[in-house]
Structure formats: C-alpha cells, structure tokens
A protein has these predicted regions:
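Small/flexible residues
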Residues: 8, 111, 124-125
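Short, low-complexity, Pro/Ser/Thr/Gly-rich segments in the mature regions of secreted, periplasmic
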Residues: 117-126
C-alpha cells in the first residue's frame, strides 16, 4: 500500500469517527425535578392465602439527568428514558415500570408474586 493510499485511508477513518462521537445521546433533563409520593394502592392480591402488606404514599423521588434517586428508607433508584419511561427498583429489588405524563405525574405498577401495587408521584414546582 502506497503512502498516499494510507494517508487517504487514515483521513477517511478519522472523518467517519467524528460524527459517531458527536452523536452521543444527550442526557435526559426534561424530567428533572423533585416528585412527591401521592399514593400506593394495592391493585390486586394475587397470592393464595397471603395478605399484601399495607401500603403508604411512596417516598419522594429526585430526577437528575435521567437518573432517579430517593433518600428515604426504601432507597428507590432508576432511570428515565427520553420519552418519559421510568424503571425503578428499591432496596428489596422490587421493580416498578412507570411513565411520566406531560403534566408531571409518574404512574407505575409493581407486579410481584403476591401483589400488584399502583404507585403515583407528582412533580413539584421549581
């Protein structure tokens, strides 16, 4: 391979690498803020002969750059996608699949082996 061919090839590879690096996904900030827990309602008890634990309003969530955290004892963590899809997990590994609507309300459901629980959080004004 001649020196000129190598130079052209190197320039082409370099030129192709620049747009790929420039297309890294931007952080999701449209949903940033604090969301206060509104309710947790047992939607269905699926366990045979087992009682679902009594529910209380979930602890507040803070969303920053697509990352969800809570500081209470339940320790919710998760992610928010660009369309408002939310996946949450707490310290007990409970998974809640949720969505943020245009009004800033997060609604989601936990589907466990014995219970289904519907959760609601509402965004607080800045």
């Amino acid at each position: 391979m001649s020196g000129q061919t190598r130079a052209v090839l190197a320039a082409a590879i370099f030129a192709l690498a620049i747009p790929a690096a420039a297309q890294a996904p931007a952080p999701v900030t449209a949903f940033d803020g604090k969301y206060v827990g509104v309710s947790a309602h047992i939607a269905k008890s699926t366990g045979h002969g087992r009682q679902c634990p009594r529910q209380h309003a979930p602890e507040a969530l803070t969303i920053t750059n697509g990352s969800v955290q809570s500081s209470g004892k339940e320790k919710w963590t998760g992610t928010v996608g660009p369309q408002g899809n939310v996946i949450l997990r707490n310290k007990l590994s409970m998974r809640v699949d949720a969505r943020i609507d245009p009004q800033g309300t997060i609604t989601g459901r936990y589907q466990g082996p014995a219970c289904m629980v519907d959760y609601v959080w509402r965004k607080q004004p800045m």
